[in-house]
Regions:
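PAPS-dependent sulfotransferases, especially Golgi type II membrane carbohydrate sulfotransferases
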Residues: 1-10, 15, 107, 174-204, ...
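Short beta-strand segments
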Residues: 11-13, 36, 119-121, 142-144, ...
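A conserved segment at the C-terminal end of the G1
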Residues: 20-32
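Short catalytic/ligand-binding loop motif for oxyanion handling, primarily in non-cytosolic enzymes
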Residues: 23, 41-44, 126-129, 148-153, ...
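Short hydrophobic/aromatic-enriched beta-strand-loop microsegments
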Residues: 33-36, 137-145, 162-164, 245
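PAPS-dependent sulfation machinery
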Residues: 37-120, 163-188, 276
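Conserved phosphate-donor/acceptor-positioning beta-strand/loop module used by diverse small-molecule
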Residues: 121-122, 135-156
Length: 311
């Protein structure tokens, strides 16, 4: 088995849970390389065609996904060349010729000389994280975000699709984990934000089991990082055996200081410089009391375990 210092690191959790922020901060440590969402079926590596794929030992698709992961960590994976609707002509041409920015960053992270630990930031690999931990000896950090904070974040971006139908097409996943959770609900009649809260319960019910079975898989609440960012990142670096440098400390302070805005500007998806102390409860500005009560119910027992009964 590899020593901990050589293990690649998967930073995962539901989408909009802070995986980009945490992944970027960890990747400031020397000897690391950042990999952006290889399991994203829209702009990640070729071969992944479903959202939130569930893979475990003995799964019918295990060998197929094992080859994909081997290619990712060896630097041989290829990202899709997908242009965004707002890309201008030269940007579209550049992507066709050179590949996306994520692919170029991936190449830099995997092809540079020297032994590098990859920081694989990917919420969409969350349901396969236990398998990746066991089969590929990866360290796994699971980011947990308040269910109402998750809904508020997706609503800010106008993201109204929560991947429940993609999850429900995965027979083994449904049989082993989710049938009991989803059976009582008429999902077709639910509002989109209700589906989002139910997805939150589905994802974290499974990830909670993974962490219970594997003590070295670490669950971290985004809110705890927001309230004490340097302290929490020092703890994460120690757990992962990553050096905590002055550069890392400065980057964390710069990204979480009180002079930064609470919310990202406009519809920006990723904005790393935020007022972290105010961010943890920012959802209360856009989620009314009745909606919060409904989200709490839909988040289920795992929501109560990590965030209590009183919001």
């Amino acid at each position: 088995m590899k020593t901990s210092r050589k293990r690649h690191i998967l930073v995962t959790g539901i989408h909009r849970s802070g995986t980009t922020f945490v992944g970027k901060m960890l990747s400031s440590a020397p000897g690391t390389g950042y990999v952006q969402e290889p399991f994203n079926p829209e702009y990640g590596v070729t071969g992944v065609d479903i959202w939130y794929p569930y893979i475990r030992q003995g799964h019918v698709s295990e060998s197929y996904y094992a080859e994909i992961v081997r290619n990712i960590v060896s630097g041989h994976a290829v990202y899709r060349k997908k242009s965004a609707d707002g890309d201008h002509f030269f940007k579209k041409t550049g992507k066709r010729l050179l590949g996306s920015r994520d692919y170029l960053q991936y190449l830099a992270s995997t092809k540079m000389p020297g032994s590098r630990r990859l920081i694989i930031k990917d919420p969409l690999a969350s349901l396969s994280s236990e398998w990746m931990h066991k089969k590929f000896d990866m360290d796994v950090i699971i980011l947990l975000r308040h269910p109402a904070g998750f809904i508020a974040s997706t609503q800010r971006l106008g993201w109204n699709y929560y991947f429940l139908s993609d999850i429900m097409t995965q027979t083994q996943l449904m049989e082993e984990y989710l049938h009991e959770i989803l059976a009582p609900f008429n999902i077709a009649s639910m509002k989109q934000w209700q589906k989002g809260a139910l997805l939150w319960q589905c994802i974290y019910s499974i990830l909670d089991v993974y962490a219970e079975r594997n003590p070295s898989i670490k669950i971290v609440r985004l809110e705890d990082i927001s309230l004490a960012p340097e302290e929490m990142f020092r703890e994460l670096h120690k757990h992962l055996e990553l050096p905590f440098t002055k550069k890392t400390a400065h980057k964390i302070q710069e990204s979480t200081g009180s002079n930064n805005p609470v919310n990202a500007p406009g519809g920006k998806v990723h904005h790393l410089q935020r007022n972290s102390r105010q961010l943890s409860n920012a959802w209360k500005r856009s989620i009314n009391r009745n909606m919060a009560i409904e989200i709490r119910k839909l988040a289920g027992p795992v929501g109560e375990k990590y965030y209590g009964k009183d919001w």
